[in-house]
C-alpha cells in the first residue's frame, strides 16, 4: 500500500521563549537544557508511535532512528548534509513552510522541533495550504523583516540565506562555553557522522528563532488578517 508520514510539531515553552528574548551571544541556560532534553524526549515519542502502529498491524519506522540515518560532510569548503530532513517532511505534510533562517514556520511558529514517523497505516492526508516553500516567511513574501539576520551572533544569516558552516562553528563555540557550566544536567546524544558513531551534548543556539515575528506564529497570516480588517 501507499506510505504516509506522520509529522509532529513540538513547540518550546513560553518560559524558554521569554528567557531567550534578551540573550545576545550565549543562549539562555533554560533553552540549552530544553534543547538537550528534547532529543531524548522526541526519541521516546517516536519509539512509542512506531510501537503503536506496529501493534495495530502496520509497518512503521522513524527516519531519525533508522540505521541508515546519518550526517555527511564534504571538505574544502566544509559542507554538512543529512540523509533525512524533518523540515521537508513537515512541508510535504502541510504543516508550514521554510524561512530565511532555514527554520520551519508552522502554525505555532518556528521555535519548534519536528520529528516524524513513516507508516503504511491509512492516515488521513492533511493538504498543504500553499505549494510556495516560503509562503510563511515575511522576508520572502514582502522583501522586509530580516529580524533573524539581526539576531544571529554568528553572522551566519543574510538576505542570501543561511551559511551552515558559520552556524556550525558558532554552535561549537557555544558548546565549549556552556557544556562545563551545565555538565551535570546534560544528556549525551549519539548520531552517525560519515559512517562513524559520534557522541555529542547538543545545546542549541536558535537566536534566529527567538524575539522574531515568526517565533510563535505565522507572521504572514497575521499581516493578511490585519489587512482584511
What are these regions (language model features)?
Residues 1-39:
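Non-catalytic, usually N-terminal nucleic-acid engagement modules in DNA/RNA processing proteins
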Residues 26-229:
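Catalytic cores of enzyme domains
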Amino acid at each position: 500500500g501507499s506510505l504516509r508520514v506522520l509529522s509532529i510539531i513540538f513547540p518550546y515553552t513560553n518560559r524558554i521563549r521569554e528567557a531567550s528574548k534578551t540573550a545576545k551571544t550565549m543562549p539562555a541556560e533554560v533553552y540549552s537544557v530544553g534543547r538537550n532534553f528534547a532529543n531524548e524526549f522526541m526519541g521516546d515519542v517516536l519509539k512509542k508511535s512506531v510501537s503503536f502502529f506496529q501493534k495495530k498491524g502496520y509497518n512503521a519506522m522513524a527516519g531519525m532512528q533508522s540505521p541508515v540515518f546519518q550526517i555527511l560532510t564534504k571538505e574544502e569548503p566544509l559542507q554538512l548534509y543529512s540523509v533525512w530532513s524533518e523540515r521537508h517532511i513537515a512541508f510535504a505534510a502541510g504543516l508550514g513552510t521554510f524561512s530565511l533562517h532555514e527554520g520551519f514556520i508552522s502554525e505555532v511558529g518556528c521555535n519548534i522541533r519536528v520529528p516524524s514517523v513513516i507508516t503504511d497505516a491509512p492516515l488521513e492526508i492533511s493538504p498543504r495550504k500553499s505549494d510556495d516553500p516560503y509562503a510563511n516567511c515575511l522576508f520572502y513574501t514582502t522583501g522586509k523583516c530580516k529580524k533573524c539576520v539581526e539576531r544571529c551572533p554568528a553572522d551566519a544569516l543574510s538576505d542570501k540565506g543561511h551559511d551552515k558552516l558559520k552556524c556550525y562553528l558558532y554552535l561549537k563555540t557555544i558548546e565549549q562555553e556552556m557544556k562545563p557550566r551545565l555538565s551535570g544536567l546534560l544528556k549525551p546524544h549519539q548520531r552517525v557522522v560519515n559512517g562513524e558513531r559520534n557522541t555529542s551534548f547538543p545545546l542549541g543556539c536558535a537566536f534566529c528563532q527567538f524575539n522574531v515575528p515568526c517565533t510563535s506564529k505565522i507572521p504572514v497570516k497575521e499581516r493578511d488578517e490585519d489587512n482584511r480588517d
